[in-house]
């Protein structure tokens, strides 16, 4: 994608996500923003019920961003901003138990942070 078209892509994506979060998309959508938020919260609750085990959750940028937004008790706009920053193959870490879920690291790429791997660093 050319630079201009990449910029246009992100601008359009941000606009659509904003409209979705405000329940302003007309026509059928696979799920509402509220349903999406609840699905992410339900997944996080299931992880918390896991008895303190180590968990590997593999996901896309949307649920990764919403998890961070929910854990930080930030507004919906934060989930959108975070989503646009999530790098492909990045690692986010949380510490959790039955009572708490806390962000430790977000969007890390230590496995790609080598000069010979810089070309592998991409965004959704």
Question: Which role fits each region the language model picked out?
Answer:
Residues 55-63:
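Short, well-ordered beta-to-alpha junction loops that form the rim of enzyme active sites
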Residues 21-25, 45, 52, 76:
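A broad detector of the eukaryotic-type serine/threonine protein kinase catalytic domain
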Residues 1-7, 34, 49-54, 69-124:
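Acidic, low-complexity terminal tails and accessory targeting/binding regions
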Residues 1-39:
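Phosphate-handling substructures
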Residues 37, 41-48:
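Generic structural signal for well-ordered alpha-helical scaffold segments
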């Amino acid at each position: 994608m050319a630079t201009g078209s990449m910029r246009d892509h992100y601008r359009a994506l941000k606009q659509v996500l904003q409209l979705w979060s405000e329940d302003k998309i007309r026509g059928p959508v696979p799920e509402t923003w509220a349903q999406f938020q609840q699905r992410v919260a339900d997944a996080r609750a299931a992880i918390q019920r896991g008895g303190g085990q180590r968990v590997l959750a593999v996901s896309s940028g949307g649920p990764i961003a919403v998890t961070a937004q929910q854990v930080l008790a930030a507004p919906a706009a934060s989930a959108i901003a975070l989503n646009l920053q999530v790098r492909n193959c990045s690692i986010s870490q949380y510490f959790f138990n039955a009572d708490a879920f806390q962000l430790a690291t977000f969007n890390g790429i230590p496995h790609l942070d080598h000069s010979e791997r810089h070309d592998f660093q991409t965004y959704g």
